[in-house]
Amino acid sequence: MQRAAGGLPALFKAREAPARAARRQRGTGVWAAAVGLGALFCAALVQYLRVPSEGQWAGIFTPPTEIFCARRSRPLVCAHGGDSAHYPPNTMAAFAAAVAGGSDCLEVDVAGTRDGVLVVLHRRELEQMVRRVGVTVGDFTFREISQMDAGNGQRVPRAEHVLRKFSPHVETLIVDIKVDGRGALGAPKSMGAAALELAGATDCTNCILWAKSDEEVRHIQSLDPSQAVGFVVMNESSLDRLEGRDKLDRLAGAANVAMHHEVASGSVLEEVRASGRRVFGWTANTPYIVRKLLDEAPVDGIVTNYPRPLLRAIDERMRACLSEREN
């Protein structure tokens, strides 16, 4: 019998090649997973290190400035995802705690699942829940999302449930529309249209709808000019500037501006208010930022993960202003 060219060694090499490729692919997958978990760990560590101590928060309980006392009304305290300093963010427990603690405003992150259900969930929280980076709410069905643990046994709530339960108990409820889902809702309905339907279905007359996407906000305005909307002003990256999010004179008819704290200043607020708009500063999670938005750039509302100390600080400052006037 004639021996095949190359013999047994060639045969073994031919059989080994697919196995080596499979091992390389598995190795790449394991490496990618490790990198992703490492990124999540670093993000969690950075977030932990950013949490101010009780001693640091004491720095916001300072005598009010003339700028603060010149306010015509106290600023709204908008609990970012509820009282997310003490409860898992964007959960029913966090929103209930914020309302019970006196917050007069809630900021709610709303995204669409793959099968078109609106839920209250931020992409950042989802990545931590599934321990994977790069995923979006639109990658999952509502059934899959509803089975996830949002923290401490809490579940991801439907947006409808949150608005129905809590909008009657606050002055303002902000729906922050998230549009980063791949395949969420699908054409032709946009997230803006879905959020508008949500506000109408829940009779949320005190809802403000805003998003980083001007296109979505314009779509809402075209569907219902009477709906309160806002747009985001930020200048953190070249992409923000490329997409025009650093511009103040956008979206005629939008009465609310969600302004990143780094952009906020007395002169900028004066320019924005000249057009009759309200300004909400975000996200005030350090004593320095809180003092800036209270004393230097007096915004109309402050979005924060720490509503409790902020509420106390505002109360003390308002009393001090009143006492100063009486004297």
Language model segments and positions:
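Phosphate-group recognition and catalysis centered on beta-loop-alpha active-site segments
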Residues: 2-327
